[in-house]
């Protein structure tokens, strides 16, 4: 939905209602709203006739999104596995009987990861747009982050369970600046600059502050051993443990 008042005050709103069969019926649907407001300052009477400022707009926005990446199908259901090799069979004489064994780890309440983003920005232009640019600052908080936690021994054949237990924060500033120093009938020279400053850190990985839980180790496909990076509170995701040269 878009609504404008005198081309000065601009309102935008949207709603997503997403569903996924990867979740149980009670968590299958996610409601994700978003809204934005922009003030076209250039259209105000006290700035409209100013030639130095060719455009000036202030922006505010907030919204939520949901994602299901990293979740396998039927993760919320108990799945029984059929034994396949000689080590997973009952020996009855010369025959080995197959059997179904305890379901793997599962969480019936697994749900959407939800990311809430807040943004404030400004668009500007000077000297008939010979100088233009924008600056944006944002904070992005992700809750119900998926993480594998240790399960009690003997609960099943797996020692970890995937569940919504973490949170992460991402914040930063982005800017761009474009300058047109030469603009004639035959020549046009434009120079652009842009940059980003970003800080990302994990803020939670467990239900409690357990000093025994140091970090979540991440598997890799190759390398010495199979562990090289980890997720840890206070650090960016996929922080690495390389050897110092």
Residues covered by each model-derived region:
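Short, intrinsically disordered, charge-balanced linker/junction segments flanking boundaries
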Residues: 239-245
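Glycine-rich, Lys/Arg-enriched anion-binding loops that position phosphate/diphosphate groups
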Residues: 236
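Extracellular/periplasmic, surface-exposed regions of secreted and cell-surface proteins
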Residues: 1-232
């Amino acid at each position: 939905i878009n609504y404008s008042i005198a081309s000065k005050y601009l309102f935008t709103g949207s709603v997503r209602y997403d569903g996924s069969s990867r979740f149980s019926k009670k968590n299958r649907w996610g409601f994700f709203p978003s809204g934005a407001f922009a003030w076209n300052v250039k259209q105000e009477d006290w700035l409209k006739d100013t030639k130095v400022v060719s455009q000036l707009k202030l922006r505010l926005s907030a919204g939520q999104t949901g994602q299901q990446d990293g979740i396998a199908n039927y993760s919320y259901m108990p799945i029984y596995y059929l034994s396949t090799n000689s080590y997973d069979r009952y020996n009855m004489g010369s025959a080995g009987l197959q059997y179904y064994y305890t379901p793997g780890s599962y969480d019936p309440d697994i749900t959407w990861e939800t990311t809430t983003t807040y943004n404030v920005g400004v668009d500007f232009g000077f000297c008939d747009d010979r100088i233009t640019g924008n600056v944006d600052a944002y904070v992005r908080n992700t809750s119900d982050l998926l993480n594998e936690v240790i399960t009690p021994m003997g609960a099943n054949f797996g020692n970890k369970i995937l569940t919504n237990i973490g949170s992460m924060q991402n914040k930063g500033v982005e800017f761009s600046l474009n300058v047109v120093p030469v603009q004639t009938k035959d020549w046009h020279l434009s120079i652009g600059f842009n940059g980003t400053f970003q800080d990302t850190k994990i803020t939670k990985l467990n239900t409690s502050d357990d000093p025994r839980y140091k970090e979540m180790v991440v598997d890799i496909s190759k390398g010495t051993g199979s562990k090289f990076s980890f997720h840890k509170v206070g650090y960016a995701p996929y922080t690495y443990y390389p050897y110092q040269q």
